[in-house]
């Protein structure tokens, strides 16, 4: 980080999934406080789509506001524990057509209660099909410009594929939200036997 003069860190605070039909934090962060000193920290919370399923949200008028409050409270607990001052929070959710309204409502409830600038991850398909997928009510989005293919035994690059990316970028200039871009800074190996991963 020092050699690359990285000043801003997006740190995954936790995932949120279901346990006993209730949203709970999964794998909370363990931060090396020395490595973040003097850096701008942006907490990132990955929200599994399952927490926005209609069987949880429909007919439960307090589910969304309670979820937003608990997410904010959990983020602030981590900030206090590590003595971090943050001004922005990012939510990462690959929302679907059936969960977008609940997810967007949670973002609005979060913004009403907490003073943070709010960003959200945006996938390529959410840019191309924005009329269907909707645009999250946040200050800006971060376009995830990676994980473009399936992991296969063929050797095709599943992290970045230019031809795949180009199929999704035709409507990028029309996207009504300011976008930053997240580029891949990783690699992985795929082990296969008999054509199977």
Task: Tell me what each language-model feature is.
Residues 1-28, 142, 147, 156-157:
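N-terminal substrate-binding region of glycoside hydrolase catalytic domains
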Residues 2-5, 35-37, 135-136, 173-175:
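Flexible, charged surface loops at secondary-structure boundaries
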Residues 6-11, 40-43, 89, 140-141, ...:
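Hydrophobic beta-strand segments of well-ordered beta-sheets in folded domains
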Residues 12-14, 43-50, 143-147, 183-185:
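Short loop/turn segments at strand-loop or loop-helix junctions that form parts
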Residues 16-140:
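Chitinase-like catalytic core of GlcNAc-active glycosidases
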Residues 108-195:
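Substrate-binding surface in catalytic domains of secreted glycosidases
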């Amino acid at each position: 980080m020092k050699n690359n003069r990285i000043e801003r860190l997006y740190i995954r605070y936790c995932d949120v999934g279901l346990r006993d039909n209730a949203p709970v934090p999964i794998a909370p962060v363990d931060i090396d406080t020395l490595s973040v000193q003097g850096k701008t920290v942006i907490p990132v919370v990955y929200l599994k789509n399952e927490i926005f399923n209609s069987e949880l949200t429909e007919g439960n008028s307090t589910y969304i506001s309670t979820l937003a409050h608990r997410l904010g409270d959990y983020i602030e607990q981590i900030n206090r524990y590590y003595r971090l001052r943050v001004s922005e929070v990012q939510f990462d959710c690959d929302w679907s057509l059936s969960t977008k309204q609940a997810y967007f409502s949670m973002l609005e409830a979060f913004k009403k209660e907490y003073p943070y600038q709010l960003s959200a991850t945006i996938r390529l398909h959410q840019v191309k099909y924005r009329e269907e997928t909707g645009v999250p009510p946040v200050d800006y989005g971060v376009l995830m410009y990676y994980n473009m293919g399936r992991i296969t035994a063929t050797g095709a690059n599943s992290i970045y594929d230019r031809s795949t990316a180009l199929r999704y970028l035709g409507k990028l200039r029309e996207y009504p939200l300011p976008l930053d871009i997240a580029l891949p800074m990783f690699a992985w190996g795929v082990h296969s036997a008999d054509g199977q991963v």
